[in-house]
Amino acid sequence: APKSIAVFGSRGADFAIRESLAMGFEGPIWSVHPQREQLMGIKCLQSVTDLPHAPDAAYVAVNAESASSTVAQLNEMGAGGALLYASGFSELSDELKIVGLDRQQRLIAAAGDMPIIGPNCYGVINALDRAVLWPDQHGCQPVDKGVGIITQSGNIGLNMTMQKVGLPIAYMFTMGNQAQVDIANVIDAMLDDPRVSAIGLHIEGIPDLVAFDAAARRALSLKIPIVAIKTGRTPAAAKIALSHTSSL
């Protein structure tokens, strides 16, 4: 569970601050922006190096070209992990595909051993520990236990949080391009948390079928149900998934 959060950028980062505070996150939240004085009442630091210490979680809402530099600095200072909001990576198509792939490879290299979620990722809500790395309003409430949801669509994730009928949501993960951390990794992390009673999946693509199979078998052995919906099964749907999160 994150004990501290750093947010980078302005669009989306302000909501991450506001929603974490509204959810009841009790740890320090730092805002980093070189040109803003404050975000949501929190004084902005100028750069990563101004942080008092490495954050447990970082919400990186800077543009695609700046993302690798920010991630490299976070990795160097020992941050726990980062979530990348920006698009403009491997999901790009046609003549921009090479540009996007190059950006994504540079991002992966910059992260090193530091976990990154995304890029092209809407966000993550941890309703158990009150941490919200999310660029918008949502319907989650603090809970002591519940289900974990993993989706590659921010729109689906947002709408699911707004439902009034259903099981309480403990985690809402949107995965984006799965450049490094993938669905199997998140399933494993959820299975390590005894507060998660079931897992729901909305899948566009599975990068590592062997790891996914192992995670699913582990869930079975722990008697944690997994309910999965796989999209992109028809040629038209596969084309949409490819342009959405570069997944098949």
Which residues are covered by each model-predicted region?
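Catalytic-core regions of core metabolic enzymes
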Residues: 1-248
